[in-house]
């Protein structure tokens, strides 16, 4: 039985890992052994941060809504409680966008919430 030479498969595997390490700094981009570890770690960070991204954006939306509603004389918690009471079902992403790009519409929602809370 002939001897199996692994040159082609090894080269392909190395090329794949080094392609994934493109843009890394130092030896992480061109030394296979180090690049392999760097690519694995990058994958772990990417996996973790895809989940964290959702939490980060929710915090951003809440901070924006809080700032906008406070400027109109209402705290975030009272604003959200008033939305629930008034049966206004708008999610935080849309409220945040509205507070930045359409302050008049956001102000009218705050007025409805204030009327509901009064």
Swiss-Prot record:
Binds directly to 23S ribosomal RNA and is necessary for the in vitro assembly process of the 50S ribosomal subunit. It is not involved in the protein synthesizing functions of that subunit. Keywords: Ribonucleoprotein, Ribosomal protein, RNA-binding, rRNA-binding. Signal peptide: none annotated. It comes from the Bacteria. One of its GO terms (biological process) is ribosomal large subunit assembly. Belongs to the bacterial ribosomal protein bL20 family. Gene3D superfamilies: 6.10.160.10, Ribosomal protein L20 (1.10.1900.20). NCBIfam families: rplT_bact (TIGR01032). It holds the Pfam family Ribosomal_L20. This is Large ribosomal subunit protein bL20. HAMAP family: Ribosomal_bL20. GO terms for cellular component: ribonucleoprotein complex; ribosome. One of its GO terms (molecular function) is rRNA binding.
